[in-house]
Swiss-Prot record:
Stated name of the protein: Bromodomain-containing protein 8
Swiss-Prot/TrEMBL keywords: Acetylation, Bromodomain, Chromatin regulator, Coiled coil, Growth regulation, Isopeptide bond, Nucleus, Phosphoprotein, Repeat, Transcription, Transcription regulation, Ubl conjugation
Signal peptide: none
Sequence position, cross-link Glycyl lysine isopeptide (Lys-Gly) (interchain with G-Cter in SUMO2): 469, 481, 509, 575, 612
PANTHER family according to UniProt: BROMODOMAIN-CONTAINING PROTEIN 8
SMART domains assigned: BROMO
Bromo domain residues: 706-811, 1099-1207
Keyword check for Coiled coil: yes
Organism: Homo sapiens
Residues found modified as N6-acetyllysine: 85, 481
Biased composition (Acidic residues): 905-915
Subunit structure of this chain's protein: Component of the NuA4 histone acetyltransferase complex which contains the catalytic subunit KAT5/TIP60 and the subunits EP400, TRRAP/PAF400, BRD8/SMAP, EPC1, DMAP1/DNMAP1, RUVBL1/TIP49, RUVBL2, ING3, actin, ACTL6A/BAF53A, MORF4L1/MRG15, MORF4L2/MRGX, MRGBP, YEATS4/GAS41, VPS72/YL1 and MEAF6. The NuA4 complex interacts with MYC and the adenovirus E1A protein. Component of a NuA4-related complex which contains EP400, TRRAP/PAF400, SRCAP, BRD8/SMAP, EPC1, DMAP1/DNMAP1, RUVBL1/TIP49, RUVBL2, actin, ACTL6A/BAF53A, VPS72 and YEATS4/GAS41. BRD8 isoform 2 interacts with RXRA/NR2B1 and THRB/ERBA2.
Record's compositionally biased regions (Basic and acidic residues): 831-846, 979-999
Glycyl lysine isopeptide (Lys-Gly) (interchain with G-Cter in SUMO1) cross-link, renumbered residues: 481
Length: 1235
């Protein structure tokens, strides 16, 4: 027929905006996956990936096909090559995807670079603002930002309006469908032509001219049943009582019956024959009163379709009067809030109501559903006429005369609803109504029109006069009462309304309860029906998408239709109340129904970009358009997973793709960003959120950091594997479930396990040793916190924690040694960043928290827990570690009492350690002067190779060498028992070497040999530390040894006098490091201090101070020789820095520091470090953050602290392995770390 022409012109009426590379890549990937013939699947899969602001039909099937054809035209087909068997030939789809992937990668690189530049610019501006340099421009900056934001919003609004206008224009010019569906109906008892079925329709020329101007449109004549939309539902006829006289005059368009109309005519025949060829069938209200048909005429010429409600009073059977002139009666309009003129129009009493096609489709669908139920429920009464082919048909309306015609989009909703209703409800319709092509088109139409924003046309409420007729006739009056309410529609399951008889009324009212402006696609839901809807799943999905795309607002429409005859006929009102099936608030309407799947249906049909992209495959999971039977099973979990990404999906643009958050929830990885303070300190630079995204970085410093990160990841995985191979690791390998540990997640708020730690390392969430150690400690802390102290898992956690921390300590020490030995006193940060990078405000007062030096130095503060709590001391395996590690102090919940860890120590090992020192102290102190020369010769021979090596490298590392006095005061005290248990392992040659050293010490200070022994036979005064044994082994001449003993006697009096009186001698140099195993720093330390260290036995304060000065002068020289030391050498003058003394109350410089050291004002390492930090802090406080002196101070402070920490750690280790039990070396400092 004529209405089916031009159906393929839609290919040229799609959106004209260019596609982004991302959208093209999504399209190409979906085509490669689903094929270039299955556009339904392709369109459905890529709908979530539309850019913000795209029109609803952007990813329509025809638009996708058109765009892909353009891609094919611009892509060269790969030439076929004869390859070997099994060789994969690249197809054109592969070429397109590969090409677009490369373009997308380049685009992302550019985006990342721009983001990094913008970040640096914003960071620089923020620092200037914080420093107070832009206080005068703050208002101007705020105004600029507000203006820019306003302009952006205006541009976005203009673009959005242009897009909407273009979309509405496309909707208006779309051609009609291939055919117009007709629902066949039957005449009731009082039909004028018994045995014939006729459709009702007021098809006067005036109506056709006005209602169908420009475009073929559908019209719908409803004799009885529901006028169902998402919000407008009118139930007319069927239950109205007889109106006073029992008859209503028919309009003049009544004509005689046509012989050809004995069958079931279609709407096309009506259009061809004209309005005078068919008689208007008669309907009755119950049995007597005639039914007023309702006609909907939506002209798609406007931005929104308009439905025309035509009230056509039917004439009884005996009445065959000629045409009677009609008069037009205008009813009063009562509008409390929003005044919308409403007029009752002339015959056939047409009232135009503006609505979009989504509501029209709902009207049509619900009419069929209700009519079908009513037809099935009540036995058909009246004559049944056979159809054209002679078969009796079951109409959708047994008691009504219905003719339906509607022009939708590509294929109208009525056709879809008709076909689906026939398929699902097994309605035996006429063969004309259903064919294979229509079914295929309907399924395609469902796929294409399921977009939530497919029909965003706003509801409008002007009810205008359709046409004027000069001939008057008493016309029925219509009362429409509208109330608006706000609610959220969750799932439309065929909502209908119940007819309610109300008192007569003669006014037309529109009463919006909540006056609002134009509301886009407002839902108006009427009636309450049982949950078991007859609407098929496809239609429900389609309706739901339309509702989700519209604003969550509903209306209760009360239509009081009053039909009267003259003035003496009372008006009978049909008042229809609409009640939402499920609302946000029950108080907004009557009989609200709570829907438990509310959250599910809101998110069922949307998928955010970030969630899809982090799943590994873009199209790994499809979104089902129609809620299926398994909706209740997996819907809740899917809704939960989609809820958060949906909120973030609006306006993110490319950022939603760049987020790439690993699929590890907060409950899985055990910590959130606001708790991970380490990240804010150590990862302040623009570090990508994952290693995968970091490969697109183009900055040179980022490339260096990436390489360092790869190396670190390989190294830390060795530590992880050591922990995973622990004998108790099976308890900590997988996350703990509530089945295994009831109530675990109510006690442990941040669960952690080894598999999560590994996943976080691979994903880039853990990027430093500090973060790794934090999560390891968190894992054990959770086990200790949940389990009771007598539980097996508690003890397993404690023991495994100790062993794993030993591994981490070894890793940190090795990392520190490698960095120190590779770079020496390098300016490069231990994080692999360039030394000239800007420091954060958090780095002003401390060394980078991720550096091994910082971790090791912080851990030393906890060593006192062992000493003060009188618990068991570390065993031999702990002493073999290079240093004391950090106890995670970033989170208070991780701060364990280290003394508790030692409760599981083996007591037999302790007895073995305690028994060995008592066997040999006496023989170690035997002074045999005659054997001194032979022992010295043996010592020289054994250390000849070591001296050769030291002579080559001592010069490079000399600035690191300071005396052990520094560590005794600045770090932690010696542990007297740290050498216990090691003497058994010492070699015989080393014992002789140490014995010779003791004799030399006894010679230099006779007091050592004369001290009486204590209760256990141990001397009350200890000999030199064990490190002296190695130092003395480096001497080449006995005179040098004596000279150094003398100088050392002066140097170290202050340090060891207070603790030597009650300590047993360390008779051996057995500190678990023989010559082959001695680390580089140990040997350097030994060589550098060989000219200073010797036995200390004199308690002379003057000599102690001289020793302290001699010890710190090399440190001061090291600092003064730094490349950035020039601004700090001399006091700052007022000429150089105006107002300096007003800002800095306690000036400090290197010259003043040296003077205070010489005059005795600085007597401890703590005071030295205090003044040193004061000097740097003054520079940071006075200068701006962008000043070069500021950066010099920050960087120099960092490097000096790192070097001092390295020395303190190793000196403490060496001293701790040789010292014995006693009081802290410096009562003032109490051994606590001072930095």
């Amino acid at each position: 027929m004529a209405t089916g022409t031009g159906k393929h012109k839609l290919l040229s009426t799609g959106p004209t905006e260019p596609w982004s590379i991302r959208e093209k890549l999504c399209l190409a990937s979906s085509v490669m996956r689903s094929g270039d013939q299955n556009w339904v699947s392709v369109s459905r899969a890529i709908k979530p990936f539309a850019e913000p602001g795209r029109p609803p039909d952007w990813f329509s099937q025809k638009h996708c096909a058109s765009q892909y054809s353009e891609l094919l035209e611009t892509t060269e087909t790969p030439k076929r090559k004869r390859g070997e068997k099994g060789e994969v030939v690249e197809t054109v789809e592969d070429v397109i995807v590969r090409k677009l992937t490369a373009e997308r990668v380049e685009e992302l690189k550019k985006v990342i670079k721009e983001t990094q530049e913008r970040y640096r610019r914003l960071k620089r501006d923020a620092e200037l603002i914080q420093a107070g340099h832009m206080d005068s421009r703050l208002d101007e900056l705020c105004n600029d930002i507000a203006t820019k934001k306003k302009l952006e919003e205006e541009e976005a609004e203009v673009k959005r309006k242009a897009t909407d206008a273009a979309y509405q224009a496309r909707q208006a010019v779309k051609t009609p469908p291939r055919r117009l569906p007709t629902v066949m109906v039957r005449s009731p008892i009082d039909s004028a032509s018994p045995g014939g079925d006729y459709p009702l329709g007021d098809l006067t020329p005036t109506t056709m001219e006005e209602a169908t101007s420009g475009v073929n449109e559908s019209e719908m004549a409803v004799a009885s049943g529901h006028l169902n939309s998402t919000g407008v539902l009118l139930e007319v006829g069927g239950v109205l009582p007889m109106i006073h006289g029992g008859e209503i005059q028919q309009t003049p368009n009544t004509v005689a019956a046509s012989p050809a109309a004995s069958g079931a005519p279609t709407l096309s025949r009506l259009l061809e024959a004209g309005p005078t060829q068919f008689t208007t069938p008669l309907a009755s209200f119950t049995t007597v009163a005639s039914e007023p048909p309702v006609k909907l005429v939506p002209p798609p010429v406007e931005s929104v379709s308009q439905a025309t409600i035509v009230m056509m009073p039917a004439l009884p059977a005996p009445s065959s009067a000629p045409a009677v002139s009609t008069t037009e009666s205008v009813a009063p309009v009562s509008q409390p809030d929003n005044c919308v003129p409403m007029e009752a129009v002339g015959d056939p009493h047409t009232v135009t109501v503006s609505m979009d096609s989504s509501e029209i489709s709902m009207i049509i669908n619900s009419i069929k559903e209700e009519c079908f139920r009513s037809g099935v429920a009540e036995a058909p009464v009246g004559s049944k006429a056979p159809s054209i082919d002679g078969k009796e048909e079951l109409d959708l309306a047994e008691k009504m005369d219905i003719a339906v015609s509607y022009t939708g989009e590509e294929l109208d909703f009525e056709t879809v609803g008709d076909i689906i209703a026939i398929i699902e409800d097994k309605v035996d319709d006429h063969p004309e109504v259903l064919d294979v092509a229509a079914v295929e088109a309907a399924l395609s139409f469902c796929e294409e029109n399921d977009d939530p924003q497919s029909l965003p046309g706003p509801w409008e409420h002007p009810i205008q006069q359709e046409r004027d007729k000069p001939v008057p006739l008493p016309a029925p009056e219509m009362t429409v009462k509208q109330e608006r309410l706000d609610f959220e529609e969750t799932e439309n399951k065929g909502i209908h309304e119940l007819v309610d008889i109300r008192e007569p009324s003669a006014e037309i009212k529109v009463e919006p309860a909540e006056p609002e402006p134009v509301i886009s696609g407002a839902e108006i839901v009427a009636g309450v029906v049982p949950a078991t809807s007859m609407e098929p799943p496809e239609l429900r999905s389609q309706d739901l998408d339309e509702e989700l795309g519209s604003t969550a607002a509903g209306e209760i429409v009360e239509a009081d239709v009053a039909i009267g005859k003259g003035d003496e006929t009372p008006l009978t009102n049909v008042k229809t109340e609409a009640s939402p099936e499920s609302m946000l608030s029950p108080s907004h309407g009557s009989n609200p129904i709570e829907d438990p799947l509310e959250a599910e249906t809101q998110h069922k049909f949307e998928m955010s970009d970030s969630l899809k992209e982090e799943s590994g495959t873009i199209f790994g999971s499809q979104i089902k358009d129609a809620p299926g039977e398994d909706e209740e099973e997996d819907g809740v979990s899917e809704a939960a997973s989609l809820e958060e990404p949906k909120e973030e999906d609006q306006g993110e643009g490319y950022l939603s793709e760049m987020d790439n958050e690993p699929p590890v929830s907060e409950s899985d990885d055990g910590f959130s960003i606001h708790n991970a303070t380490l990240q804010s300190h150590t990862l302040a630079d623009s570090i990508p959120s994952s290693p995968a995204s970091s490969q697109f970085s183009v900055c040179s410093e980022d490339q260096e950091a990436i390489q360092a990160q790869k190396i670190w990841k390989k190294a830390i995985m060795l530590v992880w594997r050591a922990a995973a191979n622990h004998r108790y690791a099976n308890v900590f390998l997988q996350p703990v479930t509530d089945d295994i540990a009831p109530g675990y997640h109510s006690i442990v708020q941040r669960p952690m396990d080894l598999s999560t730690i590994k996943k976080n390392i691979e994903n880039g969430l853990i990027r430093s040793t500090a973060e790794f150690q934090r999560d390891i400690m968190l894992m054990f802390q959770n086990a200790v916190m949940y389990n009771s102290s007598d539980h097996d898992v508690y003890h397993m956690a404690v023991e495994m924690q100790r062993d794993v921390l030993e591994q981490i300590q070894q890793f940190l020490a090795t990392q520190l040694i490698m960095q120190t030995s590779e770079s020496g006193i390098s300016a490069k940060s231990l994080r692999g960043r360039d030394s000239t990078r800007k420091q954060d405000a958090s780095e002003k007062d401390s060394v980078p928290m991720g550096s091994p030096a910082f971790l090791l130095s912080l851990f030393m503060g906890h060593e006192w827990v062992w000493l003060d709590s009188e618990q068991d001391h570390p065993n031999d395996s702990e002493l073999s570690n290079d240093c004391r590690s950090l106890f995670s102090s970033w989170d208070s919940s991780l701060d364990l009492d280290v003394g508790n860890w030692r409760e599981t120590e083996d007591p037999e090992a302790e007895e073995l350690e305690e028994s060995s020192p008592e066997r040999e102290p006496s023989e170690l102190l035997v002074g045999d002067g005659g054997s001194e020369e032979s022992q010295e010769a043996a010592r020289k021979a054994s250390h000849q190779n070591l001296l050769h090596f030291l002579s080559e490298v001592a010069y490079l590392m000399e600035p690191l060498c300071i005396s052990s006095n520094e560590s005794s005061e600045g770090c932690c005290p010696p542990s007297g028992t740290r050498q216990e248990g090691r003497e058994i392992k010492a070699s015989e040659g080393e014992r002789e070497l140490c014995r010779e050293t003791e004799e030399l010490s006894a010679k230099g200070d006779p007091l050592v040999a004369e001290k009486p022994l204590g209760e256990n036979g141990k001397p009350e005064v200890a000999s030199a530390p064990s490190v002296i044994c190695t130092v003395q082994g480096l001497l080449t001449e006995s005179e040098e040894g004596e000279a150094q003993q003398e100088s050392k006697g002066e140097d170290q009096g202050e340090v060891y006098v207070s603790e030597m009186e009650d300590q047993p001698p360390s008779g051996e140099c057995d500190d678990a490091f023989n010559i082959k195993e001695t680390p580089l720093v140990d040997t350097l330390f030994s060589h550098a201090t060989s000219s200073k260290l010797t036995d200390l036995s004199q308690d002379d304060p003057v000599q102690d101070h001289l020793l302290f000065k001699k010890t710190l002068l090399p440190v001061w020289k090291m600092i003064a020789s730094h490349r950035f030391s020039s601004p700090f050498l001399k006091p700052v003058s007022e000429r150089q820095a105006p107002g300096y003394k007003d800002v800095v109350k306690r000036p400090m410089d290197l010259t003043s520091l040296k003077r205070n050291l010489s005059k005795g004002r600085i007597r401890t390492m703590a005071q030295f470090l205090r003044d040193l930090m004061l000097m740097f802090q003054n520079a940071v406080m006075y200068n701006d953050s962008d000043h070069h002196v500021y950066h010099m101070a920050v960087e120099m402070r960092q490097e000096v602290l790192e070097q001092i920490q390295v020395l303190n750690i190793w000196l403490d280790k060496r001293k701790g392995s040789s010292s014995l039990e006693g009081e802290p070396a410096n009562p003032v400092d109490d051994g606590k770390p001072v930095f």
